[in-house]
């Protein structure tokens, strides 16, 4: 809209360091303000990133028009979503220009390594491609949390999404952006069969860390 701006954030999810005890690399975010017209972006960070347009409002989003942003150059990484086939999404992961890939479900936006998704994202039968089922599984976990804390009952469901992402520094935690698992855990947390039937710690971890993210001080806030 005239007189307004939006943020372009380029996130390098991998920055060249892998650790195990908060001694690895954290995602690096480079932010740029976009205005109407031509914007020149000089991204000079050492590692490639994925670009996100941040268009938020504190009032009713319906009061704000849609915007269009056109990138003159740069590679298209794409994102996985339930409207694509499992075969299409597998091809995207195998041929991804970036080392990481976004998955956008109805309630969860997650980011994992492209290699891990191509290798480990299997359905509950253990062999079929599992991208659609995996996104539905994550969405179900968040929907159940919304039921548990009363957001569904009192018609307070948020219109945005919660987050999950891969990290290179610690086993499992709830970071500033959402639930995070170490890259060496992708064989567990990307596999629907393991999450649903064989690995209660992994599926508990997702739900537990999202529980922290859903804490709303001072009304719902617990320690530990």
Which ranges hold each PLM region?
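Beta-strand-enriched, solvent-exposed domains that form extended recognition/catalytic surfaces
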Residues: 1-79
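A short linear-motif detector with a strong N-terminal bias
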Residues: 30-33, 81-82, 89-91, 142-143
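Low-complexity, Pro/Ser/Thr- and charge-rich linker/hinge segments at domain boundaries
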Residues: 68-102
């Amino acid at each position: 809209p005239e007189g307004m701006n939006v943020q372009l954030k380029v996130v390098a999810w991998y920055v060249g360091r892998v650790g195990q005890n908060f001694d690895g690399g954290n995602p690096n975010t480079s932010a740029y303000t976009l205005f109407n017209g031509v914007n020149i972006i000089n991204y000079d960070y050492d590692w490639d990133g994925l670009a996100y347009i941040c268009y938020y409002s504190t009032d009713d989003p319906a009061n704000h028009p849609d915007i269009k942003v056109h990138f003159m150059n740069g590679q298209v990484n794409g994102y996985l979503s339930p409207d694509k086939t499992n075969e299409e999404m597998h091809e995207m992961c195998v041929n991804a220009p970036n080392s990481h890939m976004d998955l956008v479900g109805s309630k969860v936006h997650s980011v994992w390594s492209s290699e891990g998704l191509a290798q480990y994202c299997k359905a509950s039968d253990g062999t079929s491609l599992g991208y659609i089922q995996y996104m539905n599984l994550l969405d179900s976990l968040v929907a159940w949390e919304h039921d548990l804390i009363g957001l569904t009952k009192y018609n307070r469901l948020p219109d945005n999404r919660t987050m999950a992402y891969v990290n290179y520094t610690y086993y499992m935690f709830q970071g500033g952006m959402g639930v995070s698992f170490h890259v060496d855990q992708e064989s567990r947390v990307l596999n629907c069969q393991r999450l649903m039937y064989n690995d209660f710690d992994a599926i508990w971890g997702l739900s537990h860390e999202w529980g922290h993210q859903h804490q709303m001080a001072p009304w719902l806030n617990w320690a530990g």
